Swiss-Prot record:
Keywords: Hydrolase. Its EC number is 3.5.1.-. It catalyses: carbamate + 2 H(+) = NH4(+) + CO2. It comes from Yersinia enterocolitica serotype O:8 / biotype 1B (strain NCTC 13174 / 8081). It holds the Pfam family Abhydrolase_1. Involved in pyrimidine catabolism. May facilitate the hydrolysis of carbamate, a reaction that can also occur spontaneously. Belongs to the AB hydrolase superfamily. Hydrolase RutD family. One of its GO terms (biological process) is uracil catabolic process. This is Putative carbamate hydrolase RutD. GO terms for molecular function: hydrolase activity, acting on carbon-nitrogen (but not peptide) bonds, in linear amides. The gene is rutD.
Amino acid sequence: MYFEITGQNSPAAKTVVLSAGLGGSGRFWQPQLSALGQHFRVITYDQYGTGRSAGVIPSGYTLADMADELADLLASQHIERYHFVGHALGGMIGLQLALSHPQCVERLVAINSWPVLDSQTRRCFHVRQDLLLNSGVAAYVRAQPLFLYPADWLSRNTLLLEQEEVQQIAHFQGMENLLRRLNALMNADFRSVLPHITTPTLALCATDDLLVPYPCSQALAELLPDGEWAQMSYGGHAMSVTNSEQFNGILLSYLLMDTGIAKCELALNQSNTSAIHL
């Protein structure tokens, strides 16, 4: 799989691995690279079958396959311990890594992820799937921003969206690859195994996320033995893009928590799950 390493190059620097959502591209994390790179060695990658990681996704593909592919890649680079930050599908890959490779994941941030697929998320996925199958790639790509970004942000960024649309159509991962990856995501159910994941985990969400209702993140955190949750009031599903300054601050506060650099205060809520108060 294609990957890039940026940020700190000191042997003593800790590593943070960034995993995108269904689109799969490491380029999704561009707004985070500078902030994270001041403190960490940063690894971004294109998930198998997407972007610059060409390949055909096999039938029966699962999140466990996605996690094992990444674990093997990192092991080949002698990277044995790392923080992991994943957006939606990427967060689910992180949960699977923490379950099947617990010795590798030091801290996990799962952004707009869930214990089991919510009915609203399922509805959105079915609409997107129908668009792809019945109207084609261009219609699928054109509709995608509606699920990712707040309406006012969409209005202010028309030119950027038009440019991205051209690129996304040109580099589309392929209908069969996307549908098999989507099927793996929709079928994932972590409810029975979350109590066994002891990795410190932050479930981060945006209250205006259309695709994944924000209570999914709270439910995820509450099922984890060392789960914490944080909410952003604005940004939509892709708040790492639309509200990157606040997002980066929360991310760094959590990842640097044990270093004394973090600035956000943590307080326990009534469910004994920590919530970051913004």
